[in-house]
Amino acid sequence: VAKVIEVAPIRVYEVATFYSMFNRSKVGKYHLLVCGTTPCMIRGSREIEEALLKHLGVKRNEVTQDGFFSVGEMECMGCCVNAPMITVADYSNGSEGYTYNYYEDVTPEKVVEIVEKLRKGEKPPHGTQNPQRIRSGPAGGNTTLLSDPKPPPCRDLDAC
């Protein structure tokens, strides 16, 4: 790659090791990436990863014997408000037709459920996994800015 684009090999290596979507070793048909940044960690991403590894019987970056699954870590996915979350890189249509789907508000039980649906060939709905959340809104609905704000006490600044 470095020769083709005429850059130093270290530059290619830097990019390939920085971005988690570049796989430098074999991954499963479904590569499960657990968010490893602070908001997701606070909300339980380590427990999510442990549940996946235990259920699949692999270590991080290993591929299951059937070749279907691998588990890795990914840095911020940009949906911190819906932490914790995972990405499923779906290579079932080959490396040229892959998709990335975000599963937000996941629990250890929910990620196992997602894995089992994928194993059966089903496509679990992506996005929030919390039925009480509407898109990125708070679970249970808004709690602030429910009405028009009060006007300032004095509209005529010259009179104040």
Feature map (PLM): residue ranges:
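Signature of N-terminal electron-transfer/Fe-S-associated modules in redox systems
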Residues: V1-C160
